[in-house]
Amino acid sequence: MSRIIIKNIPRYYDKEKLSTYLKSLPQLDAEITDVSVAKTKEGVSRRFAFIGFKNEEDADKAIRYLNKSYVETSRIEVHRALDYRSANEKLRPYSKYASKNIELKLQKKEKEEELRNLEEEKAKKKKDANLKRKFLDTLDPKAREFLKLSSSISNSRSWENEEVFDTEITNPVIPADEDDDEYQDLPAAKRHEGDSIKSTEHDSTLDSGVVIDGREKSSSELHEEESEQAAEGDTAKNSGTDAQAPLSDDEWLRLHRTRIKEKQPEEEVSVVGDELKSFDKENNDEHLERVTNDKIADASMLQKAENNVSEQERNIQLISETKRLFLRNLTYSCAEDDLKSLFGPFGQLEQVHMPIDKKTNNPKGFAYIDFHDADDAVRAYLELDAKPFQGRLLHVLPAKARSSILLDDYALSKLPLKKQRELKRKNTAASSTFSWNSLYMNADAVVTSLASRLGVKKTDILDPTSSDSAVKQALTETHVIQETKNFFEEHGVDLDAFKNAARSDNVLLVKNFPYGTSAEELTSLFSPFGELGRILIPPAGTIAIIEFLNAPDCRQAFSKLAYTRIKSSILYLEKAPRDVFTTSFKQSGKPELAQKVNAVEATTSEKVGTEDIESLDTATIYVKNLNFSTKQEEFQKVFKPLEGYLSAVIRAKPDPKRPGKYLSMGFGFVEFKDKASAVAAMHAMNGFVLDGHKLEIKLSHQGVDAAAEVRKQDSSKPKGTKILIKNLPFEATKKDVQSLLGAYGQLRSVRVPKKFDRSARGFAFAEFVTAREAANAMRALKNTHLLGRHLVLQYASNATMDDMQHAIEKMAKEANAEAAAPSITGKRLIETD
């Protein structure tokens, strides 16, 4: 866990102030990747913070140093932060600021939504009632009476309508001059009868649900009518008049009022006859609509429950389809190798793409991971989402599939066969694992280069009428390759790295371009894809090494320029071996060009062979007793001010516990321009204290030690004067082998085993007079091609040659015996006789 939590910090400490405080601590020398101070919704500090570090060692160091220390007057507590998922599963809310359970939040949200729907429904009903009232106010009495008489029989009982109609029409009035005592009980009975009639009218109206515009009268309207009639009855009783008085126009209107539909134009009110036809249908459909709405609501709830798939399941489904992950919240110092080491254990990776900001040349904080298998991508998502990585919580999401511009099979079939092969080869170039010989060169460019520097024609070097043209071509290539090796070594290229299978993401080997191609032309060809570092072109001008500052730019250039035409040739691109440069590139704003065109010179190996390696002066000092925590930048910073300083490096070894990481070995080397500067630096810096360690410095004998190591390794091998040449072309003759190897020493014997048809078997043996001559031939011809085949040379022991000879003799005897024996049919005939 590279993330820690600091509790009880001062309340007024924010992110900037806490970062400044941590960076000001000299003992806390570590890269801080994230600082997060917890706050409430109101912006008040909760007095704890999360701090992220680049690795776990720095986090442990910070815990040991900061725990139970004081930040101003507050004593802080520091320990490892819990994992995001573990914190949500194990911890319960302990303060009013803590988040509540997700289920409670969902329940609360559903209740609020139900209340909001009820309020909206009430408001709508109220609005409909107001619209109905306004509609009735616009009708004249005859229209209202017509609507009353034209109401559907199914919505009201006919006898009730008659009773109401009779009651409304015949309203007997008691004479005022009659004696009240004679009719003492009659008016009361009539009043009760009238009241009962009115009550029956109201009940029938309520039961029948008279519909004028497709809606029933609401209970509130009926209650309002009853209240008005009761008030009128009381008034009549108090005034001494009979309660069965005729209804006024307003009273009759209120009894028959209705509501219009929402958004119904007022000009359509007069067209009453057409609307009456749809009253019954609308009234009957209202109940059906309510039932249907209930069923739809139940179905929607069921559908909602079925579609209630969690976000994680949706992400897993998308990842299974695309096999691609999107990462965010990465540190700006994160590299693609860090992501490869993190996601590599889950399965085979197709691509790791981290976009780079062109202005700052730093990552943008997000990346894409392509897996070969969808199950591996899903497993990586489940394991690493919300997990700390370099001090930050890694956020993993499904990514969209990469856009492909490949043509389908039908479109490809319409193209010529040559064009089809070119497109397929170009599209598979980036993912292809095939590679040529690392120092492969165009044969025509090799001969043209040598002829140009010698000032002769190519026909003078390769005579078409000569039988040894292939040997001359091989010797020319050998010379150019040896010259190229020396040039690369002078410019900080580690030739031993070409033996490694791991490939670099930002360095390309550019091959097969014509002779005469300049560094400026290659720069203009590759620079549009990104910022370039070093560009190395050897004197022969047949191969180049181009370094990009950013890996994404290098990948883009590789995919766009592979197998493209350059002048009269096809450009071959190959990823260079990892760590091909011994020193890192110092960015200076423009690419560093290294191009050298010289006359033909003797190779360095030939010069060194005639000199004693121990007589060479050294300009390198050996520094030991370094602190294991001392970084490369600090080590270089100490020696950089010295006169004649060139470079400084701390030796490191791979960390077995952390793939992709390195551990300091406690010593290093500093290189100067000359021996005098190295001696002066040794006397000046010997005993200097760096990170608490006293440095011990002396002159380095690295060159002598390297030569001794080479001699030791060579002595452990079965050395001798005999060489075995493998992968020999079948067209090669004994004379070709003699001409090729004779250029490096005096040959004692050459033997090319042949088949029964007198053709070569694909290998040969050569014996030199001295072991030095054999070693020179081995070293020079290691990357040579003869008739298009890469020669493989190794020392041949006597046992190897004896075994080969014994195998050849055995095969010859078997062949002779088979030729002398009779046929199988003949044997069977003799035996039967």
Curated annotation (Swiss-Prot):
Gene Ontology terms: biological process: rRNA processing; small-subunit processome assembly
Keyword field contains Ribonucleoprotein: yes
Domain RRM: start-end pairs: 2-83, 323-401, 506-578, 619-702, 721-798
Keywords carried by this UniProt record: Nucleus, Repeat, Ribonucleoprotein, RNA-binding, rRNA processing
Example of a GO cellular component annotation carried by this entry: nucleus
Keyword Ribonucleoprotein attributed: yes
Chain positions covered by the region annotation Disordered: 160-251
Annotated function: Involved in pre-rRNA processing.
Protein's name in the database: Multiple RNA-binding domain-containing protein 1
Organism: Schizosaccharomyces pombe (strain 972 / ATCC 24843) (Fission yeast)
Record gene name: mrd1
